[in-house]
Amino acid sequence: MPQPEQLPGPNADIWNWQLQGLCRGMDSSMFFHPDGERGRARTQREQRAKEMCRRCPVIEACRSHALEVGEPYGVWGGLSESERDLLLKGTMGRTRGIRRTA
């Protein structure tokens, strides 16, 4: 099935950045953990996802989206679930100098 080049209607402003994501069309299992995944396997999968995010032209838009909507699962904008949770609670931003973009 062909991928759309632009999203329709009011969603375009919110979601169009996803069309430029390096992850577009990739297997989502790289970014979202299977049930029960823990430890080394989870860490390694997250690191592979974050490597892709670091090269992505829309990393900032992706990260902002995930923080704004409180995305509960997966690696978004180079941040894992737990990293986003810490950022949203203010802990990580203060201790590591990471700022939240809006």
UniProtKB/Swiss-Prot annotation:
Cofactor(s) in the UniProt record: [4Fe-4S] cluster
One of the GO BP terms on file: cell redox homeostasis
Binding-site list for [4Fe-4S] cluster: 23, 53, 56, 62
GO molecular function: 4 iron, 4 sulfur cluster binding; dinitrosyl-iron complex binding; DNA binding; iron-sulfur cluster binding; metal ion binding; protein-disulfide reductase [NAD(P)H] activity; protein-disulfide reductase activity
Location, primary (coarse class): cytoplasm
Top-rank taxon, per record: Bacteria
Protein induction: 100-fold induced in wild-type C57BL/6 mice 2 weeks after lung infection, RNA levels drop to 30X induced 8 weeks post-infection. Similar but less dramatic induction is seen in immunocompromised mice. Rapidly induced in resting mouse macrophages, remains up-regulated for at least 60 hours, continuing induction is repressed by interferon gamma. Induced by growth at acidic pH.
Localization, UniProt: Cytoplasm
Ranges of residues in domain 4Fe-4S Wbl-type: 22-86
GO cellular component: a single term: peptidoglycan-based cell wall
Role played: A redox-sensitive transcriptional regulator. Maintains intracellular redox homeostasis by regulating catabolic metabolism and polyketide biosynthesis. Regulates expression of the redox buffer ergothioneine (ERG) in a carbon-source-dependent manner; loss of ERG or mycothiol (MSH, the other major redox buffer in this bacteria) leads to respiratory alterations and bioenergetic deficiencies that negatively impact virulence.
Family: Belongs to the WhiB family.
Name of the protein this chain belongs to: Redox- and pH-responsive transcriptional regulator WhiB3
Organism: Mycobacterium tuberculosis (strain ATCC 25618 / H37Rv)
